[in-house]
Amino acid sequence: MKIDVLTLFPEMFQSPFEESIFKRAADKNLVRLEIHNFRDFSHDKHHAVDDTPYGGGAGMLLKPEPLFEAVEAVMEKDPTPAPVILLSPQGRTFNQSVARELANHQRLIIICGHYEGFDERVREHLATDEISIGDFVLTGGELAAMVVIDAVSRLIPGVLGSDDSSESDSHSNGLLEHPHYTRPPVFRGWDIPEVLLSGNHARIDRWRRKESLRRTLKRRPDMLEKITLSKADRKLIDEILAEENPKD
């Protein structure tokens, strides 16, 4: 996958993507990140990319000309089709389902906003998608872009050591992930669950599914309303409820 990022602060992307999993993915040519400063496409003497809003109001808006020219230049250099994504608090909420959707593309173009927002013509005539990472406001879209890039990159085959790694992540199957343990089996008097030492994979799988359901039920019960639970899942939930609320 190729990801083009349009930003006013290209330096912000240097360190995070030169380390760990993303660096290995880039070294294998599984993911290619290209950063473009759209200030380079402003042609006035001050290289201005923002201006005051018509009708008055607080803040400055990103002008349409530099953004349109930047996207057009990027597409001229490489005509591979790509969604043009605005990162904005007004967009659809980013989640694991959206990450999977984006991971199916060969290429993404991501525009990082700044200041008060965009001239509406950018939203109407340039962007093909608009994404928000949550109901809060950031100074710019750069951190949001990093979140999207990281989440999407993990889903590209070969980026993680095993495809099972991304499939078992929280939210990948609609549930929070089960607890994990490693050596030592006893630490400061705290034991790991006996079933994990049993070698019985069927029991271990059942325990993991049950604990995933338990954690989701406790922390994010809303998630259970969005998935189809099997008869076995419902039986596990009944067991959990009986354990959590024992009768006298």
From Swiss-Prot:
One of the GO BP terms on file: tRNA N1-guanine methylation
EC main group: transferase
Catalysed conversion reaction: guanosine(37) in tRNA + S-adenosyl-L-methionine = N(1)-methylguanosine(37) in tRNA + S-adenosyl-L-homocysteine + H(+)
Any one Pfam family match given in the protein's UniProt record, by short name: tRNA_m1G_MT
Compartment(s): Cytoplasm
SUPFAM superfamilies to which the protein is assigned, alphabetical: alpha/beta knot (SSF75217)
Annotated EC: 2.1.1.228
InterPro entries for this protein: Alpha/beta_knot_MTases, tRNA_m1G_MeTrfase_C_sf, tRNA_m1G_MeTrfase_TrmD, tRNA_m1G_MTases_N, tRNA_MeTrfase_TRMD/TRM10
Task performed by this protein: Specifically methylates guanosine-37 in various tRNAs.
HAMAP family linked: TrmD (MF_00605)
NCBIfam families: PRK00026.1, trmD
Subunit structure: Homodimer.
Protein name: tRNA (guanine-N(1)-)-methyltransferase
Native source species: Dehalococcoides mccartyi (strain ATCC BAA-2266 / KCTC 15142 / 195)
